């Protein structure tokens, strides 16, 4: 990541949680990044984070997974709210960007803070876990419990698009397994993923919202993004050519979309499906 990045801490309950900062406050909104399941700033935003910092102030949280049963989305969204309270001035405009589970958390933050959040960008997010997603999570949990050598390959099959994988040899695809490092925190987050349902909170979102779907996503099907689009007023929808790992397959496009919508939302009319500028 960018050498000018600053890592700091903020108080939450009786903890000190890490967040990262890059860029300077400007005429554009300050961006808050929220990573996905089993991730952190480095894993999910290593390219996106510093590139966004060229034009505006960007904060990225490393979420803490509480050691408790029956996690709730608010166990994470309240961490983001605490970061905003600690690190963002009252007169700073805010754009919240969430990826995957981070998109679910971002939606919860926007619903809770209402007008405090000016813009909301949901990357590969969902509102209510489908039976297909539950099946995939069940397989993941079983492979994790068994410490199966097949788990990293299953994760990569779900994570990447056919186009991304098919450009690599069989051995190169198998070698991707070395980047998958499942953890107990990820397992607890996936248990939460199994029962996500934020549909009742979506009408409370007042932020101008951009919903980004990944056309070849095996983890979060496009239908989930369409449900978000139908449920959030003042939203617009775009599909990009990528699997779930858009931070690897389409990072430049993500940076472009986030910059354009955060800085110039008037270019994206509400309640419209937007055509991507990249093929």
Which residues does each predicted region cover?
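Acidic catalytic loop of the alpha/beta-hydrolase fold
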Residues: 215-220, 245
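Short beta-strand/loop motif that positions the catalytic acidic residue
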Residues: 205, 211-213, 217
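Gly/Ala-rich beta-loop-alpha elbow adjacent to hydrolase catalytic centers
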Residues: 98-102, 106
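Conserved alpha/beta-hydrolase catalytic His-Asp/Glu region
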Residues: 131-134, 149-201
């Amino acid at each position: 990541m960018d050498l000018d990045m600053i890592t700091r801490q903020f108080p939450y309950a009786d903890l000190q949680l890490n967040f990262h900062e890059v860029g300077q406050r400007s005429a554009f909104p300050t961006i808050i990044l929220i990573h996905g399941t089993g991730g952190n700033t480095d894993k999910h935003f290593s390219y996106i984070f510093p590139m966004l910092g060229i034009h505006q102030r960007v904060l990225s949280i490393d979420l803490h997974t509480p050691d408790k049963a029956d996690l709730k989305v608010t166990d994470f969204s309240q961490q983001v709210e605490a970061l905003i309270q600690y690190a963002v001035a009252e007169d700073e405009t805010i754009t919240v960007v969430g990826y995957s589970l981070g998109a679910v958390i971002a939606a919860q933050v926007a619903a809770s803070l209402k007008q405090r959040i000016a813009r909301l960008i949901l990357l590969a997010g969902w509102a209510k876990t489908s039976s297909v997603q539950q099946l995939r999570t069940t397989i993941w949990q079983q492979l994790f419990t068994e410490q199966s050598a097949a788990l990293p390959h299953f994760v990569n099959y779900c994570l990447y698009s056919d186009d991304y994988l098919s450009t690599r040899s069989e051995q190169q695809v198998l070698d991707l397994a070395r980047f998958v490092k499942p953890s107990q925190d990820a397992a607890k987050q996936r248990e939460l993923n199994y029962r996500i349902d934020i549909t009742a909170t979506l009408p409370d979102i007042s932020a101008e919202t951009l919903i980004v779907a990944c056309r070849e996503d095996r983890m979060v099907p496009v239908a989930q993004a369409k449900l978000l689009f139908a449920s959030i007023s003042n939203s617009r929808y775009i599909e990009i050519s990528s699997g779930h790992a858009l931070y690897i397959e389409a990072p430049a496009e993500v940076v472009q979309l986030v910059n354009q919508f955060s800085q110039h939302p008037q270019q994206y009319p509400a309640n419209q499906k937007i055509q991507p500028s990249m093929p």
